[in-house]
């Protein structure tokens, strides 16, 4: 009877230790996965923001883009260049060039060229600031970077918006 009781106590102790270790391991694994997911999302967001910002600032400083604003339209070659840029860039879904009257000189949906910019978040860009914004455009909810396009004299000609749709981000 004593040995049976000690075996039973040993068995219970083993079960308790096993259960405790299993719970601790599961909690540690969940914590590690949570930390990894957080850093992965953070890294993705940083890379996305860098790409949107770099693209917009590079285009805004381009002589080709300034030429489009001075002409009041994009040539077929410019449209092809912008189309290719959007098609080949990871996570960039929308590129828009708009003048100070909010008229689009370029949009990925060519039917929207000549139409008014949508989103209502362009005010600071027209005031000379560059910034990120989340707004609803013609292609839905977007994470955007907006920046002014300046003439060689420093005057604001319009603005560029480079966006990733939230469906792309999610």
Model-inferred region functions:
Residues 62-116:
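Extracytoplasmic/periplasmic helical hairpin
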Residues 107-140:
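Extracytoplasmic/periplasmic sensor domains and loops in membrane signaling proteins
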Residues 75, 139-142, 161-170:
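Helix-start (N-cap) segments at beta->loop->alpha junctions
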Residues 7-38:
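Extreme N-terminal signal-anchor transmembrane helix of membrane signaling/transducer proteins, especially
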Residues 157-158:
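Short beta-strand edge/capping elements of PAS-family sensory modules
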